[in-house]
Amino acid sequence: MTATKPLVILKETILAGESKTINMEIAKLHTMNKLKIPIIVERSKLDGPTVLFTACLHGDEINGTEIVRQLIVQKINKPKRGTIICIPIINIFGFINKTREFPDGRDLNRVFPGSKTGSLASRFA
């Protein structure tokens, strides 16, 4: 069975059999440099499940980042069926600052499912 429905993430369309890196802009630093998080999407031509690998939900817990990186480098993230999405660093703020929390002092793991009008961490969730 072939995959027929395109996948849309952040207004980017990923077709069956396609690979794409989407850079999600999440903020601007005081230097006006854009802060982006890469989302690596690999799709098979065949239908199947969608699997998401993430790491660094807490910015000071970085071991998972290397695991996700190895999945990508070794091409383990190329699915035979379905879609694999990799996000090596979720909490880029905490990662840069070597801290668990977002700049607003909140633990991202405690604000799911989030809110469009909430704190920075809540909006991100």
What are these regions (language model features)?
Residues 1-125:
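Structured catalytic-domain cores with a bias toward divalent-metal coordination
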